[in-house]
Amino acid sequence: MAKSHLLQWLLLLPTLCCPGAAITSASSLECAQGPQFWCQSLEHAVQCRALGHCLQEVWGHAGANDLCQECEDIVHLLTKMTKEDAFQEAIRKFLEQECDILPLKLLVPRCRQVLDVYLPLVIDYFQSQINPKAICNHVGLCPRGQAKPEQNPGMPDAVPNPLLDKLVLPVLPGALLARPGPHTQDFSEQQLPIPLPFCWLCRTLIKRVQAVIPKGVLAVAVSQVCHVVPLVVGGICQCLAERYTVLLLDALLGRVVPQLVCGLVLRCSTEDAMGPALPAVEPLIEEWPLQDTECHFCKSVINQAWNTSEQAMPQAMHQACLRFWLDRQKCEQFVEQHMPQLLALVPRSQDAHITCQALGVCEAPASPLQCFQTPHL
């Protein structure tokens, strides 16, 4: 497993059990420096017996940028998961089943052929080019422009910010550059009566994968590594892991993966790769479970308010409640209760789900600092 600041908490076990066993330990002189030294790292806090102070007085008031490293570590962990044979085989079998149920049976063998040719390339390119720093920049957990010490200053991010608007990635492998374009001309039209809509096919398959990936289950799986960490540290680790993982999966699956796969591999345009959601694939908001009602309200209200002026936002938010026949009153109450926060968040928002996470009404609050601020700490 890759070295991880999040996972280094496991290395604190010898320190917690018997301080003399630690490879490096803080001296009494260093600990005498006070909070400035204690709270530089979790290791220092434990060695100086100041963990409670740092949790309550320093880390609990830290900015999201202080957690940048943990964010990057979880991206590394998720990327590592894609290298597992079982994971790749599960994705392949699922996509093969999706090919088999295509309504036009003439597309089935071609769909299978696309999987055979492109899936290994996509997985390999994803593993080698995804940049944790760029991903964490995208979700707002790392300051932009901050390079890792081992990163060459001239090296571009693998997933830079312009990816939000158009596909901009490093030089492609020759195998990918040699592949056909959106209509895959090497699959001759003479073999089929119609041109093959491979960008549509790509977009459909990607969204099908997104719909079935259990993000909550993955988040809990990532957090399992925290269970061997004792006492309060384990609770913080698990909380951070679960919240970060869902946030990162939202960012990766929602924007990065569709553009990476369909834009790079099939050279679909940005519009093709990120086109309108397919009704048969994208889950409808009305199908969400009852426990997500407030999250449902929030996303609908934000989507309604996006295309209005700041002056018209309150009215637009109330109008969004008209679609909820049975829960209109609850929706109105939600809008009234959260109106000040919504008016502040919506103008700066690019993603309704992330914004509602920041508001605390959708799963995985956008600020993992809540892990530090919970009452039991």
UniProtKB/Swiss-Prot annotation:
Occurrences of domain Saposin B-type (ranges): 64-146, 195-272, 291-366
Please tell me whether the keyword Disulfide bond is annotated for this protein.
yes
A cellular component term from Gene Ontology for this protein is:
membrane
Q: Where this protein primarily resides, as one coarse class?
A: secreted
Q: Would you indicate the residue range of the signal peptide?
A: 1-22
Glycosylated residues are: 307
Q: What is one process in the GO biological process aspect for this record?
A: respiratory gaseous exchange by respiratory system
Please give the PROSITE patterns that the UniProt record associates with this protein. Answer: SAP_A (PS51110), SAP_B (PS50015)
Residues forming the Saposin A-type domain are 24-64
Q: Does the keyword Cell division apply?
A: no
Provide this UniProt record's keywords sorted from A to Z: Disulfide bond, Gaseous exchange, Glycoprotein, Repeat, Secreted, Signal, Surface film
The source's superkingdom equals: Eukaryota
What are the annotated disulfide bridges?
68-142, 71-136, 99-111, 199-268, 202-262, 226-237, 295-362, 298-356, 321-331
The protein's location, in the record's own words, is: Secreted, Extracellular space, Surface film
Proregion residues are 23-191, 271-377
Additional information: Pulmonary surfactant consists of 90% lipid and 10% protein. There are 4 surfactant-associated proteins: 2 collagenous, carbohydrate-binding glycoproteins (SP-A and SP-D) and 2 small hydrophobic proteins (SP-B and SP-C).
> Which purpose does this protein serve, as stated in its record?
Pulmonary surfactant-associated proteins promote alveolar stability by lowering the surface tension at the air-liquid interface in the peripheral air spaces. SP-B increases the collapse pressure of palmitic acid to nearly 70 millinewtons per meter.
Subunit info here reads: Homodimer; disulfide-linked.
Record's protein name:
Pulmonary surfactant-associated protein B
Which species?
A: Mus musculus
Which gene holds the coding sequence for this protein? Sftpb
